[in-house]
C-alpha cells in the first residue's frame, strides 16, 4: 500500500512537471493557517525553477509563511480563496543579505515575505490574498527594519504582478528596487497601523506600468524613489483609485539621489487625505526631476492638492558616498485636474539659487474648504534642508497657489474658489520670472484683498483673467520689485482697479540662514550681491571645532560668476571632496563629510576652486540624522 502511495505521488509530480504547474499541497503545504508552510511552498518554487520555469499553484486555504524566494521563470499563482499570511514570529523569516547598494538596504528592512534579487521573468498572479498580519503584530515602529516587508523585488527584469490583494503590511507593502520592465495590473493594496506602511514603492526602476489598481494605506500609496544613484524613469500610472491615504497618494521622494524622469500619471481618483498631498513631486538629495505629466485627476477632501519642491537635504545613500551637485527640476505639466474640499493651498517652491522651471498648469479647478490666517509675504520659511512635505508650509499667503523661486510658469484656464471668510489672495508669487497667466479666474472673499499678489517678479503676463467677486484690485504688486508686468484684456468689475502697487516688504534673507554654533563667516572682502565674499581663486583655510559626534555636513554659501559650472573643492585630513556649483546667486553647497569627528575636535579645512568665478561668504556645519527612515 505504501509503495502504491509513493508511486501515486511521483505520478502527480511528473504530471505537474509536464504541464509546468506545481501545486504547493502536493509538496506538503497544509493550508490550515497554523502550520508554517514556507518550506513546502519554497520547494514548489525551487522545483519549478530547476525545471526551467513553471507556475506554482496555491489553492484555496490559509498558508502561514515566513520568507519565500522567487526565482527565474516562476509564476506564483494564488487561486481564489488562497491567502498567504505572514508569521508573527521573527524567527520564521530569513534575514536576507541584499547585494545592491541602496539606502533601504538593512536600514529599512531585512525581513521579507516574498523576496527576489536578480530574477527574470517572474510573476505573482491570481485573485488570492497576501496578508502581512501587520495590524496585530510588529507594532513597534522603530527600528523600522524589525518589521517585515511584504514583497521586495530587487534588480529583477520582466516582472508581472496581477490581480492579487496585498493587505495589512507591517512595513512597506510592495517595494520594487532597480527593476526593469514591470507590469502591475488590477491589484489592491490596503493597510492600517502606525509607522512607514507604504503601498507601492517604485525605486530606481525603469519601464514600469501600474494600472487599474486600488490603494488605501497608512503612509504613501504610490511613491517613486531613488534610494541610490540610479534614475527612476519611464513610469506610467493610470486608472487607479486612492482612498483614505495617511501619506500622499502619488509622490516622488523623499529619497531622491538618482532622480526622476519621464513619469506619466493619468485618469486617477484621489479621496480623503487628511495631512498630506494628492500629488507631491519632490527632489531633495541632488537628483533631477524632468518631464513629468499628471492629467485627468480628480480629488476630494485632500489636505493639499499638489506640492512641487526642490530642496537641499543632500543625504547620502550609503557610507563613503556624498551628494556632489544639485540637479534641475523642470518640465512638469499638470492638466485637467479638479479638486474639491482642499484644506491647504498648493505650492511650487524652489531655491533662491536654483529655480524650478518650465511648469505648465492647464484646466485646473480647485475649491478650498478651509480659510486660514497667513504669514506675511516676506516671512514664508525656507526649510531647505528639512524633510520635505506639503504641510511644512502651512499658513501660506495664498489660499490656492503659492509659488517661490520658479521660472517659465504657465497657468491657463484655471478656476479657484475660496472658503467662507478667506482673506488671502488666490495666488501669490515671489521670485518668479517669465510667467504667463491666461484665463485665470478666482474668488476673492475680502474686498480689500487682491486676486493675485506679486513680489520680486520679472516678465509677467496676465491676460483674459478676472475675479468672480468685486474686490478692489485684480493684481497687487510690491513697489519696485516687479519688472515687465503686462496686463492684457482682463475683465474688471466696475470700480475695480486692474493693478495697484503697495509698499515693498523687506526680506530678512533669501536663503535659509539656519541655526548652528559651528560657523565661519567672511568678514573682509568684496561685496557681492549684498554679501561679504572671498574669491576662491585663492584658497580659504577654515578651522572649525565640533560640538558633538555624528554625521556632519559642511555647508558652504557660494555663488558662481562664471558662465559655466565650476568645481568647488574641500580638503581635510587627507580627504578631497568636490562639489559642482551651477548657479549664479547665493546658495548653499551642502557636502556630507566622509569622516566623523568627536566632540571638541578641531578640523582644518581648505576650500578652493579649480577655475575662476566662485565666491564664498559662509561656512556652516550641520548634523545629519542619516539613520532616519522616510
Where are these regions (language model features)?
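Positively charged n-region of N-terminal signal peptides that target proteins for export
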Residues: 1-4
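Sec-dependent N-terminal signal peptides
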Residues: 6-8
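Extracellular/periplasmic carbohydrate-active domains that bind, remodel
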Residues: 10, 16-504, 559-563, 580-587
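Glycan-recognition and processing domains
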Residues: 501-545, 557, 616-630
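Extended extracellular/luminal ectodomain segments enriched in beta-structured repeat modules
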Residues: 546-554, 600
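Short, surface-exposed beta-strand/strand-loop-strand elements in extracellular ectodomains
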Residues: 564-575
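Extracellular carbohydrate recognition and processing domains
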Residues: 574-599
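Short beta-strand-plus-loop segments that form exposed binding edges in beta-rich domains
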Residues: 605-613
Amino acid at each position: 500500500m505504501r509503495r502504491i502511495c509513493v508511486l501515486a505521488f511521483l505520478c502527480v509530480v511528473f504530471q505537474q512537471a509536464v504541464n509546468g504547474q506545481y501545486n504547493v499541497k502536493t509538496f506538503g503545504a497544509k493550508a490550515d493557517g497554523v502550520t508554517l508552510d514556507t518550506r513546502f511552498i519554497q520547494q514548489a518554487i525551487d522545483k519549478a525553477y530547476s525545471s526551467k520555469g513553471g507556475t506554482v499553484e496555491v489553492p484555496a486555504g490559509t498558508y502561514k509563511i515566513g520568507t519565500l524566494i522567487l526565482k527565474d521563470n516562476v509564476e506564483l499563482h494564488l487561486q481564489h480563496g488562497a491567502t498567504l499570511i505572514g508569521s508573527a514570529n521573527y524567527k520564521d523569516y530569513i534575514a536576507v543579505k541584499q547585494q545592491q547598494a541602496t539606502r533601504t538596504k538593512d536600514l529599512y528592512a531585512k525581513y521579507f515575505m516574498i523576496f527576489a534579487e536578480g530574477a527574470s521573468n517572474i510573476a505573482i498572479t491570481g485573485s488570492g490574498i497576501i496578508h502581512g498580519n501587520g495590524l496585530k503584530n510588529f507594532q513597534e515602529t522603530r527600528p523600522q527594519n524589525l518589521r517585515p516587508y511584504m514583497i521586495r523585488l530587487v534588480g529583477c527584469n520582466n516582472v508581472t504582478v496581477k490581480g492579487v490583494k496585498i493587505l495589512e503590511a507591517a512595513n512597506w507593502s510592495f517595494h520594487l528596487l532597480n527593476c526593469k520592465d514591470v507590469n502591475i495590473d488590477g491589484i489592491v493594496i490596503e493597510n492600517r497601523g502606525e509607522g512607514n506602511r507604504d503601498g507601492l514603492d517604485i525605486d530606481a526602476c525603469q519601464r514600469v506600468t501600474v494600472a487599474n489598481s486600488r490603494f488605501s494605506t497608512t503612509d504613501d500609496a504610490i511613491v517613486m524613489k531613488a534610494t541610490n544613484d540610479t534614475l527612476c524613469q519611464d513610469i506610467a500610472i493610470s486608472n487607479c483609485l486612492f482612498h483614505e491615504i495617511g501619506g500622499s497618494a502619488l509622490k516622488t521622494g523623499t529619497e531622491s539621489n538618482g532622480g526622476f524622469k519621464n513619469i506619466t500619471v493619468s485618469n486617477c481618483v484621489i479621496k480623503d487625505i487628511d495631512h498630506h498631498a494628492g500629488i507631491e513631486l519632490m527632489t531633495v538629495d541632488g537628483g533631477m526631476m524632468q518631464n513629468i505629466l499628471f492629467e485627468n485627476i480628480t480629488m476630494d477632501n485632500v489636505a493639499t492638492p499638489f506640492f512641487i519642491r526642490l530642496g537641499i537635504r543632500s543625504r547620502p545613500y550609503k557610507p563613503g558616498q556624498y551628494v556632489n551637485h544639485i540637479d534641475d527640476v523642470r518640465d512638469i505639466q499638470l492638466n485637467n485636474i479638479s479638486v474639491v474640499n482642499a484644506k491647504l493651498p498648493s505650492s511650487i517652491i524652489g531655491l533662491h539659487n536654483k529655480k524650478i522651471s518650465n511648469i505648465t498648469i492647464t484646466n485646473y479647478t480647485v475649491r478650498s474648504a478651509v480659510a486660514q490666517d497667513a504669514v506675511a509675504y516676506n516671512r514664508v520659511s525656507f526649510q531647505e534642508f528639512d524633510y520635505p512635505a506639503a504641510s511644512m508650509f502651512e499658513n501660506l499667503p495664498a489660499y490656492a497657489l503659492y509659488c517661490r523661486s520658479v521660472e517659465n510658469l504657465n497657468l491657463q484656464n484655471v478656476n479657484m474658489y475660496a472658503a467662507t471668510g478667506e482673506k488671502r489672495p488666490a495666488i501669490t508669487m515671489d521670485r518668479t520670472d517669465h510667467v504667463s497667466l491666461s484665463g485665470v479666474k478666482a474668488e476673492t472673499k475680502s474686498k480689500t484683498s487682491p486676486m493675485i499678489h506679486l513680489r520680486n517678479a520679472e516678465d509677467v503676463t496676465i491676460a483674459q483673467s478676472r475675479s468672480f467677486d468685486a474686490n478692489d484690485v485684480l493684481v497687487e504688486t510690491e513697489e519696485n520689485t516687479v519688472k515687465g508686468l503686462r496686463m492684457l484684456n482682463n475683465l474688471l468689475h466696475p470700480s475695480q482697479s486692474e493693478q495697484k502697487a503697495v509698499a515693498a516688504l523687506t526680506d530678512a534673507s533669501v536663503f535659509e540662514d539656519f541655526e548652528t554654533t559651528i560657523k565661519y563667516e567672511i568678514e573682509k572682502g568684496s561685496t557681492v550681491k549684498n554679501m561679504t565674499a572671498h574669491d576662491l581663486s585663492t584658497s580659504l583655510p577654515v578651522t572649525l571645532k565640533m560640538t558633538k559626534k555624528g554625521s556632519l555636513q559642511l555647508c558652504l554659501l557660494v555663488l558662481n560668476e562664471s558662465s559655466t559650472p565650476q568645481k568647488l573643492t574641500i580638503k581635510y585630513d587627507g580627504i578631497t571632496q568636490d562639489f559642482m556649483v551651477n548657479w549664479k546667486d547665493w546658495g548653499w553647497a551642502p557636502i556630507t563629510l566622509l569622516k566623523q569627528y568627536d566632540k571638541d575636535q578641531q578640523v582644518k579645512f581648505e576650500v578652493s576652486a579649480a577655475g575662476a568665478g566662485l565666491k564664498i561668504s559662509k561656512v556652516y556645519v550641520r548634523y545629519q540624522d542619516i539613520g532616519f527612515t522616510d
